[in-house]
Amino acid sequence: MRLKIFFIVCLSFLSLVCSASDVVWYNGKSPVNYSVCEQHDKVVDVALDLFSSDMQAVTGRYANKKSNSVIEIYQLDRLSNKEFGQLSKYSIPINKFITQPDAFYLANTGRKVVVVGSNGRGTAYGILELSRLAGVSPWIWWGDVRPTSKEYLIMKDGYKSLQIPSVRYRGLSIGGEDWTLRPWSKTLDHRLPAGAIGPRTYKKLFELMLRLRANLLWPADDLGTTPFNRVKGNLEVADSCAIIVGSKDPLLRDDKVEWGSRNGEYNNADNHRWLQHYWEEGLKTAGTGEKMFTVGLGNFAILGARNEHDKRQLLQKTVHEQLKLIKKTEDKLNKKNKNAPADYPTLIIANDEVRSLLGNGLQLPDATTVLWPDDGYGYLLPAQGHLSANRKGAEGVLVHLSYQGTPHDCLWLSTPQPGLLVSQLDAALARKANRVWIAEIHEPKVAAYALSLFFDKAWNTSSVTSDHLERHLTSWLSAQFGQTLGQRLLPVMREYYRLTAIRKPEFMGWNQLTSDKDNPKVNDTEFSTDDFGNELERYLSDFRALKNRVDELSQEVPAPLHAAFFAAVAFPVKAAEAMARKQLCAQESREISRPGTFHHDEEALEAAAASLDAYDDLCSLSRQYDALGGGKWAGLMNMSPRNLSVFASPSLPDNLSQKERRQYGVGMELNSQLDAENATAATAAQYDHFSGMITTVPLLGHSQRAVRMAAGSSVDYNFHLSGSGDALLYLAFVPVRPQSNGSMRVSVCFDGGKPIDIDLACPQGTDEWKKAVLRGQLLKKIPLAVDGYRSNHTLRLTAIDDGVMFDQWMIDFVDDRTFYMIPTK
């Protein structure tokens, strides 16, 4: 009787919220049902399994396949004539997307919820779009984001959504997995030998990629990792999930592991026969699924050539031979495969040597995509102007969300500023690099928002712009934690991105790596304890306030989302804060202490105890991460990737006794008062006038409001100076690279004087580039003479070239001041 009353109440409620033409696809009584066309790809079944599980999480009951269901699912390229006839009764604009790979249409039509995909992937994306509409986050498994239960699910009258991907190939690259993904994978593939990442791990990764609408994988390929194709089941699970398999190295090989000294030189001139055999054998083991082939000579130097002309000829010959080898091998493998791909997409990575040759007449087939990489830290390298202007073939970009290399690894947290990611992808679009986009990460969980942002942008390039970036972040946070908490978390994440832009946690050791085997000691930071009111403690104070705010908001998180909140918000904020506290308090202790007096100096002991407490906090946070979900993520978050010195226990004047730890470990008092006497500073966005095309980019730069400037645009500032005489003008820029003609220049004019031109090109590998990458700013310094008879002053900065990202400026009358942060509020 009670159950009957409940259903009557539910039906009464539905009648109030639904119009006659709305479609109720879950009514609170029966499980969600669907029908699907008879012939469809395996990936559709994978998506339906995910959808069924999603519905169980939302409604308490798994979705079922059933004829004459309210949800109808069609895969256009596998339909029978009868099924086409059934579909024709609905008003669906099939001609707009039938030839578009991976596209789908979802609509309330004919009192049905109809999902139509152009191919298997498109159909799968359409099915999982229903999960999104039901409130299921793509991070339901990887992020432990449990959806809110629903009493009913309705598709409103008139709802229709046609989605066609902007970028054809949307890829994920795994790199730096030695310390994270690979050891964690043993929790899923525990029977596999050391070094192998197996099909259970990749299945979970591919399911995430389906939810994010990524379709291309460059598998994990670090030196200790077994090549993807050698692990039984990996190719099969990729095929079942319709994931295109590619590789960083040529022709689906893993050169770091598979090319040994026994093979001789990686030299296609003098060792041609063996290289051809090596590549052909690799192709034979690559299976019959979809593939994308990297061509060229990878990261090896082009050997066997005496000069640039010979290098160019040899590389052109190599690519030509590789394309013939690909066609020969693939045609043979797919001879009996009626679903064989119609073409074999290829790309070449424009590393330094290839870029140089592209600028000197290297000819590549138009069918081969040129993939422009970033510098490892999110700043796209310049394209070759001749290639971009004259080549008909497609282009793409590779963006790192984490990185192993010089000047320092980023393999712990993933802290790319959203504004940088979007602005660089917009730069790629401006130069028509929109065929292939690949994001590299050491493991996906730590980069949940960055990956969501990247693949949302790749799916629909106009859906995420600088103007709406904070709205996108708020929407993502709300999708994970609910609208109220999501809105409250926006300022938290804004501040997190600001503080980690000032210095990434991995860079807090203030040292540089010169090779993979290098591990230099930790140095003192450039944060001053004397100037601008102790900027070291001010930075720590800001981090402390942020951590406290996270603790406050954690009390509002529903119990089912505790694990999700910890991993996505609490852990990164608290870990970054603890790293800063560990290093900066240790530095204060070293600076305060004098030889022989350390154990009698309360200030030095307090700072040392605070540093040790921070290290203990890092250990505790890592243990909490390992314990999430009953050990589900054990091994994924390593607190000391590659055992670099920045992650070690703090370097202090001497050891503290347990008694000293208890006595002085009560927390330091922090001086957070800003004192900018004799200096005037502002953010770039605080201009009084502007001309030309400029855009303020949120979540970018130390200011979090960097100004993107087109060639010929200018910004003007009017201000008062209290001093006169000699001064220094500091100009801070986001260290993006030239994108058009290889140059990036600005001119600056103070008080209407003669303009001074400044070169911002900052070539990769130079000391200036290394410092700029580590600082997150390119800092330029210009001497000024300030007229004491003027009370009001002006500053004009003009972009000579496109792409300038202006961040902050300061005029300082103290010529020997030591500081790290420009003191803007």
Which role fits each region the language model picked out?
Residues 21-164:
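Contiguous, structured surface segment used for ligand recognition
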Residues 114-117, 178-198, 215-225, 259-274, ...:
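The substrate-binding groove and active-site-proximal loops of carbohydrate-active enzymes
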Residues 139-194, 200-220, 393-396:
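An acidic-aromatic substrate-binding cleft motif
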Residues 146-150, 473-637, 713-715:
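C-terminal non-catalytic alpha-helical accessory regions
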Residues 153, 222, 229, 237-239, ...:
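Gly/Pro-rich turn-and-neighbor structural signature
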Residues 210, 215-218, 225, 372-378, ...:
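Structured mid-domain segments that build the active-site/substrate or prosthetic-cofactor binding neighborhood
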Residues 604-676, 690:
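C-terminal amphipathic alpha-helical interaction region
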Residues 646-825:
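Extracytoplasmic
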